């Protein structure tokens, strides 16, 4: 587990009925990873070297579709954070392997939450969504994800009040 990755595959059919719908959702998933890279990198438990070698970034752009188009022309092959080279699945490769059940479940719950966002929000809404907004929308039943985010100090949805 010190060197293996935890790769999560998402069926393209779960992301939309048509190829065009699937491509739009995939572009928003990629956009989410680029927009919230610092938080997701911390969540991943990987080193910078490991990410660069096995799960490299595609690069930020404020237009999700442009990230996807750049990725399609990339020479990274499957060694990208969001791997789109598989015919029937999108593969998320960012996460370090684990034998801990709670870390495993937190990772699955995170990927599901990201995918749900990408399906339900349009490009403009994704562009405006902060990490705190994302965390606020996590399903309360995703207890492992919420606990893991708190452990990593990534759970930032509680408002801060100013004291006089």
Model regions and ranges:
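Active-site histidine-anchored catalytic micro-motif
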Residues: 1-3, 12
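C-terminal accessory/tail domains of diverse enzymes
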Residues: 13-164
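A general secondary-structure signal for short beta-strands and their flanking turns/coil
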Residues: 3-5, 87
């Amino acid at each position: 587990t010190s060197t293996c990755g935890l790769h999560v595959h998402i069926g393209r059919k779960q992301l939309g009925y048509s190829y065009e719908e699937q491509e739009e959702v995939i572009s928003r998933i990629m956009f989410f990873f680029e927009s919230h890279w610092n938080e997701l990198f911390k969540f991943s438990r990987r080193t910078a070297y490991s990410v660069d070698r096995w799960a490299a970034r595609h690069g930020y752009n404020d237009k999700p579709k442009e990230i996807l188009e750049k990725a399609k022309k990339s020479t990274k092959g499957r060694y990208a954070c969001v791997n789109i080279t598989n015919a029937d699945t999108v593969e998320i490769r960012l996460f370090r392997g684990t034998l801990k059940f709670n870390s495993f479940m937190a990772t699955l719950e995170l990927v599901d939450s990201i995918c749900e966002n990408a399906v339900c929000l349009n490009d403009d809404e994704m562009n405006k969504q902060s990490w705190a907004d994302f965390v606020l929308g996590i399903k309360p039943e995703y207890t492992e994800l919420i606990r893991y985010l708190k452990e990593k100090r990534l759970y930032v949805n509680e408002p801060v009040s100013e004291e006089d």
